[in-house]
Amino acid sequence: MLDKTKRYLIVGLGLLGGKYALELSKAGFHVDGINRSKGHLQYALDHGYIASGKTHDFEDLVSQADHIIFGLYPTALIDWFKTYGHLIKPGCIFTDVSGVKTGLVEPVQAMCPEGVEFIASHPMAGRETSSVEHAAEVSFAPANFIITPTEKNTPEAVQWAKELAEVLGFRHICTLTVQEHDKMIGYVSQLCHAIAVSLMCANDNSSLCEYTGDSFRDLTRIARINEKMWAELFLWNKENLIAEIDQFDSALDQLRDALVADDRDKLEEMFRLSTQRRAAFDKKDS
C-alpha cells in the first residue's frame, strides 16, 4: 500500500490533475498543487483538492515532493522539466497522465537527476469538458489504467504506479511498452475522436437537433473537444493515427462499394462481423 506519509505534488490542475488531487486528498494523502491559472488553483484550494498551491515561486513545493504527477501536455511537461527538473529530490518517483508516450518518455527519463525515476502512465478516463471545476465528474471506477515501463524503470516504480492506480479507483491496470501503447491508443481513442470530429465537420448540422436520435448523439459525444490538447496528441502520434485512418477508410470503402453494387450479402456480412466483435467486446468489458 502507498505510504501516506509521502507528499504528493500535482503539476497542472486540469481535469485529470484535479481528479488525482481530489482522490488522493480524500484517501488521506498530503497533496500540493502547481498551476498557471490562479482561479483554478483557488478552486482546488477552496474545495479541499490540495493542501497548498502556487502559481509561481514554487521551487520549495517541487523539492519537498516525494511523488509528482504531471497533468500537462507532452510539450509543456518536457519544457517544465528542462527548467525545474533539477529541483526534484533523490528518491522521488513521478508519473504523468499523457495520452501519447513516444517522444515523451525517453527524453524525460534521460533528463532525470540521479535517484529520480519517471514511470509513465495513462489513465483512460476523462470527459468532453476540461478544467479542475469538472474533475469531480470524472469516474475512474470503470476505467483502465495503463503503465508503460521501460528498461530504465525499477520494479519498485512499477509497483508504486500500480498502487497509485488502485488508490485512485481504477478497475483494470495493465502494462504496455511505449510503442504498444501509442499504436493501441491510435485506434481505440484517437481514431474515434477523428471520426467524431469528421462527422460533425462533414455537414452543417445546426438544424438537426430536433430530428436526431441516440445514434448521432452517442457517436458525436466526443466531438466536443479540447482543440489544443487533441491537436498536440494527434500530431505527436500521427504515424499511428494515419495508419488507423487508412485502415478505417478501407473498411468504409468496402461498405460503400457494397452499396454501389447493391450487394446485400456483403452488407449483411459486415453487419454480422461488427455485431460479433461488439458482443465479444461487451463480454470482456463486463
What are these regions (language model features)?
Residues 58-88, 92-93:
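Rossmann-like NAD(P)-binding element
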